[in-house]
């Protein structure tokens, strides 16, 4: 449509060769979906984002319920446009920057969301997907969120719930051991879940922070905008 209006890149760059022209589309100019209408949740589905939103407490995957694909596309457009402007400063030449939403979303999602599909050799270990370990933790009066990204932090979680011996157990004491035996990862999760149910949210967060484990409350929108931080 833009070409029919006489405002396409080829037409305008003929007038101004230094032009940086940015095109944003759902699927790009080629491919079987190139003429389809599209919005954010459709891109989430096609890029695999929805399938990786796995909550063990819910038997099916779910959307990221905000504009995940739209915003990742906007960030990509900003970066690509800045790079094109720098290239023009260095070379004097303009260019056509094409950003399909499906490409931008996939690039943004891939490093962690698809890590198991990155190294596919027979001897490769894709590790534990974040979608299987990012969970809310239920306490006696609500839910909190924490994440242990190292062996030291995992031991800190065990200490925070009053069971430092769990962090010393060879089944749980290293990420290598847990990755090699995923059933132990599940077992430790069940043990910790039971321990957190005996603590309230404030107690749990204080204990985790004391153990130097990243943690915090699950705030409502209203609570978030008045949080002192």
Describe these PLM feature segments:
Residues 3-149, 159:
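Active-site-adjacent "lid/gating" segments in soluble enzymes
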Residues 29-31, 175, 225:
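Generic structural signal for helix capping and beta-alpha/helix-loop junctions
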Residues 1-2, 194:
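Short strand->helix junction
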Residues 26, 222-223:
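Conserved beta-strand edge residues that scaffold enzyme active sites
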Residues 85-89, 196, 225:
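Hydrophobic residues in alpha-helical segments
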Residues 34-35, 178-181, 227-229:
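Short secondary-structure transition/capping segments
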Residues 123, 130, 223-229:
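Active-site-adjacent capping/gating segments
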Residues 133-211, 215, 222:
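Aromatic-enriched alpha-helical interface/lid elements that frame and gate functional surfaces
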């Amino acid at each position: 449509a833009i070409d029919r209006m006489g405002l396409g890149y080829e037409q305008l760059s003929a007038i101004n060769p230094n032009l940086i022209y940015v095109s944003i589309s759902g699927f790009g100019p080629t491919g079987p979906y190139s003429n389809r209408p599209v919005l954010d949740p459709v891109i989430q589905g096609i890029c695999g984002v929805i399938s990786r939103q796995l909550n063990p407490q819910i038997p099916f995957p779910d959307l990221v319920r905000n504009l995940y694909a739209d915003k990742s596309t906007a960030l990509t457009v900003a970066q690509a446009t800045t790079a094109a402007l720098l290239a023009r400063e260095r070379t004097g030449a303009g260019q056509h920057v094409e950003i399909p939403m499906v490409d931008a979303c996939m690039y943004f999602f891939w490093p962690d969301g698809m890590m198991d599909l990155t190294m596919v050799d027979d001897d490769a270990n894709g590790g534990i997907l974040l979608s299987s370990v990012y969970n809310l933790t239920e306490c006696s009066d609500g839910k909190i969120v924490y994440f242990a990204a190292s062996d030291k932090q995992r031991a800190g979680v065990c200490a925070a719930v009053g069971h430092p011996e769990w962090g010393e157990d060879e089944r749980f004491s290293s990420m290598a051991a847990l990755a090699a035996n995923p059933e132990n990862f599940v077992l430790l999760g069940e043990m910790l879940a039971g321990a957190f149910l005996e603590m309230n949210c404030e107690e749990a967060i204080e204990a985790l922070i004391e153990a130097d484990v990243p943690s915090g409350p699950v705030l409502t929108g209203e609570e978030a905008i008045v949080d002192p931080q």
